[in-house]
């Protein structure tokens, strides 16, 4: 009697006449085994390992009388028709109601997605004709401590065949599988998730607990503030700030008033804070190695007219090892102006302007905060890495490249799916709290994604001795190079043997990336010119991309099914780039949120037009965020900085090669001296 029937009978208060013991379910056995201590697990393993790991008895497929055929393709067609789902594991089963299903055979799809599984109908059981079902599986892996790979298979779908099939031939035909599909409605390379649907992956269990632990202390605070607002009793910004844990800048101001608003601190955070970005030389001071420029062109995008977001042009200078702002030029629209390219009035501020200089610095700081959230954080890390994650999941199965990349690509599509409505979109936090409209945000992200390419990327060199971010980035980049070189030395032969998967991976990347974007200013100043002020190492090759019609932003690794000269090195560079942004770069932008965006009056995503304009003091609350936006900002900054799960050195899922862990541990003291606790760097983007 089946377990199901025995339990139904028991639930009705009846007793089974059968004396046989209740059948243990696999999950029951797994829970029991997980509860044993190490000594007990070793004892059980000694007794069962030979049977658990024993391969199924193999039979010569040619001797099996029946065959099931078919072809697996992606749900969505490509330009030339159906796209093959290559190298997926497929299993053929006999469905049985109330008793365990019977395994009939297995195989793999070929390069065209076709499969043929030979089987014996008698394996369905005596007197039973098989009820055919096809099941598909994707590969998973873990690493043992010695670097050996352990492969497992995760079921991703199934296709029902006929009941009581008595023939010796069955063709499942072309089976369309909705697997890691691109969203045809998005100009970016984004994963398609239907309304009320879920992505084809899941968070590791520990991540949910870490999220709850981080957010629980502040969730009630935010909800209380929001309820007070709905009741018409919104708390003051000072009360909102005081209700949250003390932020870094608030503590510094308490201990040393004015310290975080100083020119020196402004420059230091541009070098080493979450605002850290590429520092170009000042093009108006050719040959001056001490002069720098940061330019943020916001007038190119649609704005809501309620917030003030001018073009920001900051000129900086190294003075005795410190980067100091010396001039800020703001291209101010008129209040209420919304159209891209609206007329602007340019105003210049210097330290001699007193309160106006402080207001200009605040505007520049807010602008840099929005830029890092849309650029360094959401664009260059989250959405940029997502396009590599989709292409990798669609194409890498037999190639060992999967073992190198997948640990750093897992979960990014999940957190990005949450961002679709939480941060961006018509009701997203960035849309509500900044000057950019939904269209403005989308266009900015499209332009940003059009400027990202793996080819030729290397972290920029430090501009001064105190440029800790750049030094840490270069050290991390070097260690990734050592890790990847060793991986290719170990697996290079098989990697090249499965190069056709690399070609398909590369094809998907290029096909679905946005067109390269080069703004009018750079198009006029850089391509074909020396332009020594322009930092090229972290930018795409403008000479190659500033042509008409514009090529795709992401460069191809290969165009053939076997590697050509230089292409293996190109693939190494791509891997290094992806892992760098999924780990170090994201950690730096994300983990410093509470440090640099934990005080509403210090920095936020948008200042409003007030009665006296937008360039006023912090005491003028007309320009500051509204209470509901303020509490949400602090909640988000805390959540991003304090959700701790998925660190490289913890390696909870054991999917990162132990070599990378060893390299980072060996250089932990060097990172610490640069202000980075390497234990806080995640292996992937999951927050």
Task: Annotate the PLM regions.
Residues 55, 64-66, 114-123, 289-300:
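Charged, amphipathic alpha-helical segments
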Residues 191-687:
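Long, compositionally biased charged/polar stretches
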Residues 66, 72-77, 93, 109, ...:
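Hydrophobic alpha-helical segments, especially N-terminal targeting/anchoring helices
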Residues 98-118:
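Short, acidic Ser/Thr/Gly-rich low-complexity loop/linker segments typical of extracellular
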Residues 70, 90-92, 113-117, 134, ...:
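Structural signal for hydrophobic/aromatic residues that build the beta-strand cores
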């Amino acid at each position: 009697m089946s377990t199901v029937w025995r339990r139904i009978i028991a639930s009705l208060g009846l007793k089974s006449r059968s004396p046989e013991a209740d059948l243990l379910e696999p999950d029951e056995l797994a829970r029991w085994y997980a509860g044993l201590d190490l000594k007990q697990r070793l004892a059980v393993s000694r007794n069962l390992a030979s049977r658990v790991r024993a391969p199924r008895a193999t039979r010569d497929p040619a001797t099996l009388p029946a065959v099931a055929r078919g072809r697996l393709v992606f749900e969505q067609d490509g330009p030339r028709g159906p796209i093959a789902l290559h190298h997926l594991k497929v299993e053929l089963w006999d469905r049985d109601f109330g008793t365990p299903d019977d395994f009939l055979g297995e195989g793999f799809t070929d390069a065209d997605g076709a499969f043929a599984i030979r089987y014996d109908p008698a394996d369905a059981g005596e007197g039973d004709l098989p009820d055919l079902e096809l099941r598909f599986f994707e590969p998973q892996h873990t690493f043992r401590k010695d670097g050996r790979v352990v492969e497992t298979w995760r079921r991703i779908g199934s296709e029902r065949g006929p009941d009581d099939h008595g023939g010796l031939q069955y063709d499942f035909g072309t089976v369309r599988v909705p697997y890691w599909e691109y969203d045809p409605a998005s100009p970016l390379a984004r994963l398609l998730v239907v309304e009320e649907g879920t992505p084809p992956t899941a968070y590791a269990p520990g991540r949910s607990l870490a999220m709850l632990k981080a957010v629980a202390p502040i969730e009630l605070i935010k909800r209380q503030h929001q309820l007070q607002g709905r009741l018409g009793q919104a708390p003051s910004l000072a009360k909102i700030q005081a209700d949250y844990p003390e932020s870094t800048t608030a503590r510094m101001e308490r201990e040393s008033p004015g310290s975080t608003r100083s020119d020196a601190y402004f420059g230091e955070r541009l070098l080493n804070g979450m605002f850290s970005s590429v520092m170009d030389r000042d093009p108006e001071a050719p040959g001056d190695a001490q002069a720098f420029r940061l330019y943020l062109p916001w007038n190119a995008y649609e704005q809501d007219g309620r917030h003030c977001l001018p073009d920001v042009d900051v000129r900086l200078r190294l003075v005795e090892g410190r980067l100091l702002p010396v001039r800020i030029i703001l291209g101010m629209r008129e209040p209420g102006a919304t159209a891209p390219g609206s007329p602007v009035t340019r105003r210049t501020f210097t330290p001699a302007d007193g309160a106006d200089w402080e207001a200009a610095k605040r505007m520049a700081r807010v602008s840099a905060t929005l830029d890092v959230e849309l650029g360094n954080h959401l664009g260059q890390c989250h959405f940029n890495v997502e396009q590599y994650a989709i292409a990798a999941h669609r194409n890498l199965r037999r190639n060992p490249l999967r073992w190198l990349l997948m640990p750093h690509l897992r979960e990014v599509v999940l957190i990005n799916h949450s961002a679709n409505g939480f941060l961006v979109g018509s009701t997203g936090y960035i849309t509500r709290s900044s000057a950019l409209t939904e269209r403005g945000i989308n266009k900015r992200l499209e332009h940003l994604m059009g400027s990202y390419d793996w080819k030729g990327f290397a972290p920029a060199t430090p501009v001064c001795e105190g440029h800790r971010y750049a030094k840490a980035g270069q050290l991390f980049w070097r260690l990734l190079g050592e890790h990847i070189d060793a991986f290719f030395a170990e697996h290079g032969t098989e990697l090249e043997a499965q190069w056709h998967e690399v070609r398909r991976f590369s094809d998907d990347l290029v096909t679905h990336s946005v067109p390269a974007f080069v703004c009018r200013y750079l198009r006029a100043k850089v391509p074909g010119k020396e332009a020594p002020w322009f930092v090229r190492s972290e930018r795409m090759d403008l000479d190659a991309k500033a042509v008409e019609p514009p090529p795709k932003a992401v460069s191809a690794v290969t165009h053939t099914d076997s590697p050509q000269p230089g292409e293996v090195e190109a693939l190494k560079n791509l891997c290094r780039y992806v892992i760098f942004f999924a780990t170090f770069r994201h950690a730096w932008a994300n983990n410093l949120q509470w440090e640099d965006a934990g005080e509403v009056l210090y920095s936020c995503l948008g200042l409003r037009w007030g009665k006296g304009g937008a360039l006023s003091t912090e005491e003028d609350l007309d320009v500051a965020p509204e209470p509901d936006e303020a509490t949400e900002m602090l909640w988000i900054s805390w959540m991003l900085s304090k959700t701790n799960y998925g660190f490289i050195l913890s390696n909870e899922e054991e999917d990162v090669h132990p070599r990378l862990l060893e390299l980072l541990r060996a250089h932990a003291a060097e990172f610490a001296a640069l202000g980075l606790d390497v234990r806080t760097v995640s292996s992937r983007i999951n927050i």
